[in-house]
A protein has these predicted regions:
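Carbohydrate-binding/catalytic loop surfaces
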Residues: 27-33, 70-83, 113-127, 169-194, ...
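Inter-helical turn/loop segments and adjacent helix faces that build the functional surface
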Residues: 39, 86, 138-150, 209-221, ...
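Acidic/serine-rich, low-complexity amphipathic helices located in mid- to C-terminal regulatory regions
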Residues: 126-141
Length: 355
């Protein structure tokens, strides 16, 4: 129902917010890719291919792509899928062009990618998903396998080392070595809080990476360790009544905190995929069941038969305080939340998981 709603609302997938060639479009389209892989329905494949054909010229150039940020790279992961689907040389060239953006991409002193070329020294947990959804798939299916996998592990390890809170597996929203960054602690450069959706991006990329990299890949165990620590802590901070997670994840008893649909759906996807892929045992089955029930309470049909998703923010950057996170405007059908619910619902309703 959600996929059908999206195709009615956005007959052209490039019209999905927030602009042409942007990470929410890539995120949403991966939901359609998974749905196509589970159902074989051509309408879902065609929807994704329409986007790819609209953006990639015969010479492989990509309209809208600049490589200005990790966000700008994310939709390139859909082009890796298009290349695998079609074998067309233009998609290979397009993937190579996205890969080339990493050649001069700015890094901090740890070797970690800045979130954007315009954000000196800043690493956001969100950026791991944005950059590595492409980079890991390029290595797995296009080329430069060893280097792509090594870089993927390196970036995950850097952010984990810089952003983990108190050996919990939970990560603060970001880290900056730039003393001018307003949200960064003067003591250690960290953001002040653990944002639900930000942690959700990190959670999802962990299972995506583990599903794509062979077990013998150097650094695989460190990524698996991060996932297993994260799952154990997420179980502890899941709201037992609603099955959902809070906007500021670990402040479960702090006044004003509320259940974030976007991050909660991302966590549900992560738990489900981790379970299906054998990255964890059955100890999280109840977390998954309660999480799915909770997500369903945030999705309501309107009189036209369209599914609407409630209680999430649109495009939230790193904030300076707890109050800023909890008072950020909530929107119906926030672009990240809708796509996250699509990912989670497909994972819950179909046993097979793309690897």
């Amino acid at each position: 129902t959600l996929a059908d709603t999206l195709m009615r609302r956005f007959p052209d997938p490039d019209a999905y917010p927030y602009r042409s060639w942007s990470y929410p479009q890539g995120f949403m389209l991966w939901g359609f890719i998974r749905l196509y892989e589970k159902t074989g329905k051509e309408e879902y494949r065609s929807y994704v291919m329409r986007y790819c054909e609209e953006h990639v010229a015969p010479d492989g150039s990509i309209s809208g792509f600049t490589g200005c940020s990790l966000d700008d790279i994310m939709a390139g992961s859909v082009l890796v899928w298009a290349y695998r689907q079609t074998g067309e040389e233009k998609y290979k060239k397009a993937c190579d062009a996205v890969r080339a953006a990493f050649s001069d991409y700015p890094r901090n002193s740890d070797g970690g990618f800045w979130h954007g070329r315009h954000l000196p020294g800043e690493m956001w947990v969100d950026g791991l998903f944005m950059g590595l959804m492409f980079l890991t798939r390029y290595g797995a299916f296009v080329g430069d396998r060893e280097a792509c996998f090594a870089e993927t592990v390196r970036q995950l390890n850097i952010v984990f080392a810089r952003c983990e809170k108190d050996n919990s597996g939970l990560l603060y929203h970001g880290f900056s070595e730039n003393p001018e960054t307003p949200w960064a602690s003067r003591l250690d450069g960290r953001a002040q809080e653990i944002w639900c959706e930000g942690l959700g991006w990190y959670a999802m990329i962990l299972v995506e990476v583990l599903a794509l990299m062979p077990r013998e890949t150097p650094g695989y165990d460190s990524v698996l360790m991060q996932l297993q620590k994260l799952l154990a802590s997420l179980k502890k901070v899941q709201d037992p009544l609603s099955g959902l997670w809070f906007q500021v994840v670990d402040r479960t008893r702090t006044p004003g905190n509320w259940h974030d649909t976007s991050g909660s759906a991302m966590f549900l996807y992560t738990f489900r995929k981790a379970s299906l892929c054998g990255f964890c045992g059955d100890e999280y089955d109840e977390v998954i069941r309660k999480g799915f029930e909770g997500i369903k309470t945030k999705c309501l049909l309107d009189l036209e038969g369209n599914l609407n998703v409630y209680d999430a923010c649109d495009g939230l950057g790193i904030q300076v305080s707890y109050d800023h996170y909890i008072h950020y405007t909530k929107n119906v059908n926030a672009k990240e939340a809708v796509a996250a619910v699509l990912w989670a619902s497909v994972a819950m309703e179909y046993e097979g998981i793309e690897g």
